[in-house]
Amino acid sequence: MPAFHPETADQNDLTGRVAVVTGANSGLGLETARALAARGAHVVMACRNPQKAADAVAEIAANAPGGVEAMPLDLASLKSVEAFAAAFRDRFAALDLLINNAGVMVPPFGLTAEGFELQFGTNHLGHFALTARLCDRLLAAPRARVVNVASIAHRAGRIDFDTLDTPPTARTYRATAAYGQSKLANLLFTLELQRRFTAAGVAATAAAAHPGWSSTNLQANLRIAELMNPLFAQSPAQGALPTLYAALMDAAAGGYFGPDGFMEMRGKGVAPAARTARAQDVSAAERLWTHSERLTGVHFDIPARRAPAAA
């Protein structure tokens, strides 16, 4: 695959399109929002910290012909997800791009507002509920795209279905295992969402991406990053390229993309990324979907597209 440059993307002119980017106040999310705004999209930066969000809006507003704004969203609270979706639906009739980018990585033990393990609750359940609550706006767009930002850490991930209802305690919590589980969940969610879009015959599609090893504040809890980043890490702008490819290329639907270099850690371009067998398990994807609907109390409504009437 040749090196990818957003300027040559299939969907390079985003004038009139609406995009939501979660976690857009810094790192990969900020670079993704910057690139989409520069191409004419109206970008909604969905962020937890209002001041950081305002600063990010000010940083990119001068090169955002379609406009950019911030709206509050805390993915660790399903009530916040519901409030964000309601506010968005009040103002926008359609959503063209939903970039599920925000996340937490190997933090100290914590729980979401509803009592889920923090990484699974934020990285997967929060985005699952957000996508479900915005689904009708996605289906109202001519050809919407949902992009879930995953990680090479999914390779070590396993979904422990037996314990999803009973989060770990501070004593039993394993941060790295929990992160891997949440990133595997991102890929299984993408797999099942794309399957359901296809089965319904709708124009919306889903794709996934990962940034390789990129230097962002997501690594604040990784002490090894202090040593590794100067040697191996790429910039947030470079790390955002797979996300932009997944969002803007027509053929990316259903795919998973990452850097094209050594071990997918970094690269000058974008290439299809490797998925483990667990990340391609259709039955596990459907099972996770069912569990996620039950845990969040939010259900998707993807009505089948009606065939045109016979002449």
Write out the residue ranges for each language-model feature.
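Active-site rim elements
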Residues: 173-180, 228-232, 274-281
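Phosphate/oxyanion-binding loops and surfaces in catalytic or ligand/nucleic-acid-binding neighborhoods
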Residues: 149, 249, 295
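SDR active-site lid
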Residues: 196-276
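C-terminal tail/cap regions
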Residues: 2, 252-311
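Soluble or luminal CAZymes and related metallo-dependent hydrolases
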Residues: 80, 126, 185, 235-238, ...
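Rossmann-fold NAD(P)H-dependent dehydrogenase/reductase core
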Residues: 1-220, 298-307
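Residue-level signal for the nucleotide or nucleotide-sugar donor/cofactor binding architecture
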Residues: 48, 76, 233-237, 241, ...
